Every structure is written in C-alpha cells, then in structure tokens.
C-alpha cells in the first residue's frame, strides 16, 4: 500500500516539527535529509516544505547540509521550479513592501529571495539554467510560459525588473 502524500497544510506542520528537532540536534543531517527527500517528492509536500524552510527562522536554508542538498538535487525539476517561483515571488514582494515602507516585511522577503538564490546555485545547473531562462523570457520579453504566472500575481514593470535582476544575481555569484 502506497504512503499517503501530505497535504500542503500537513507538510508545513511536519516540516516545522522536523526543523525544530534538527535545531535541537535531536535528528541528524542525514535523517532530516531523508525525510525532506520524501516530503519534496509531492508538489504539496514540496510547497509546504519551502514555505516553512524559506520564510521561517530555522537556519537550515542558511547552511544547507550536503545530505539535504543531495536530496533536493535528486528531486529534480519540481524543486527547481518551486525555487524559481519562490525567488520571483519573494523578490516582487520585497518591492511591494519597500513601496509601503514596511521595512520588516521587506527584509523578510529579501531573506527568502537570498535563500532561493543560494539554493538554486546548489541545484542541478542545467535544470536551473533552463528554468531561469524561462522566467527571464517572461520578465524581459513578455513571452513564454511564465507570462501567465507573472500576470496571475499582477506583477508590474518595477517588480518584473527586480525579478529579472534576481535571476541574473543567481548566475553571477
């Protein structure tokens, strides 16, 4: 009998518990990595994992253990896609928060964006390059598959410029 995949909400709750155990040194990098590998094998699981790990206070995404990087790389294009989308969304939200003068929220969005950039540098280079080029095509030329994504969230010209800059920043470092 196949294991039931977690819902998005369950994935967030499970991830938060795992990260707390990891922070408290109750589980090893390797055990955490195995659990993350299972979690990111489904779209909802991966979404829940990234919401908690990218936006939360855990240091995991700031100092990714090799075992975790290996599991995230092995997950392939699904993890790359979510990481690129999170890069775009957090970058656009940093612009929004900057406009409204909410420096705390802006800093949080910038932290997520930085974490996404660093993660993307450690994932499979060919997949990352292809996915970033697709996003760039939409932000710069308003063509390709990501135009609908940008329009869905209502990103304006300033946000699209910031997103394209964040794409180039991934490649520069």
What is each of the regions a protein language model found here?
Residues 1-26, 127-173:
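Low-complexity intrinsically disordered segments
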Residues 5, 9, 26, 40, ...:
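Alpha-solenoid helical-repeat scaffolds
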Residues 29-32, 36, 75, 99-109:
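Alpha-helical rod/repeat scaffolding segments in eukaryotic adaptors/tethers
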Residues 32-73:
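A glycine-rich, hydrophobic loop/mini-helix early in the fold
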Residues 43-47, 57-60, 79, 123-127, ...:
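Short secondary-structure junctions and interdomain/linker hinges
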Residues 55, 61-99, 103:
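Aromatic- and glycine-enriched beta-alpha-beta binding-site module
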Residues 87-152:
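Conserved binding-pocket/active-site segment within a compact domain
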């Amino acid at each position: 009998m196949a294991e039931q995949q977690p819902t998005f909400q369950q994935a967030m709750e499970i991830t938060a518990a795992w990260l707390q155990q990891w922070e408290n040194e109750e589980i090893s990098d390797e055990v955490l990595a195995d659990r993350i590998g299972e979690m990111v094998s489904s779209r909802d699981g991966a979404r829940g994992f990234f919401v908690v790990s990218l936006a939360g206070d855990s240091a995991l995404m700031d100092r990714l253990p090799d075992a975790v990087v290996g599991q995230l790389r092995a997950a392939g294009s699904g993890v790359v896609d979510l990481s690129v989308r999170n890069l775009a969304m957090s970058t656009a939200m940093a612009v929004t928060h900057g406009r409204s003068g909410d420096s705390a929220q802006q800093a949080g969005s910038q932290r997520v964006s930085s974490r996404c950039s660093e993660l993307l540098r450690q994932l499979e280079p060919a997949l990352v390059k292809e996915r970033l080029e697709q996003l760039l095509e939409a932000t710069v030329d308003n063509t390709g598959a990501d135009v609908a994504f940008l329009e869905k969230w209502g990103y304006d010209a300033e946000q699209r410029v910031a997103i394209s800059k964040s794409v180039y920043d991934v490649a520069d470092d």
